[in-house]
Amino acid sequence: MAKGQSLQDPFLNALRRERIPVSIYLVNGIKLQGQVESFDQFVILLKNTVSQMVYKHAISTVVPARPVAHHTAPAAGDSDSQSEE
């Protein structure tokens, strides 16, 4: 499993399970809002008044409406996850 997936999947899964409203900003500046209905390696299905399939490569930022408890343990040797300056 790729390192990126180990962060994405638990985060998106928590958003889906808890039905947390999200704002998704695309690389072209467009803001989409809704709830994560499902996702896979390449797309997120976002539900609002309609369902939209959003390609992950077009996403800049995912902003939850409230804090998300996504239980991920830092990988061994991942020094920047706990560092403070």
UniProtKB/Swiss-Prot annotation:
Domain of life: Bacteria
Assembly mode: Homohexamer.
This protein's UniProt keywords: RNA-binding, Stress response
Keyword Transferase: no
Protein name: RNA-binding protein Hfq
PANTHER family: RNA-BINDING PROTEIN HFQ
Cellular component, GO annotation: cytosol
InterPro entries referenced in this protein's UniProt entry, alphabetically: Hfq, LSM_dom_sf, Sm
Signal peptide stretch: none
Any one GO molecular-function label of the UniProt entry: RNA binding
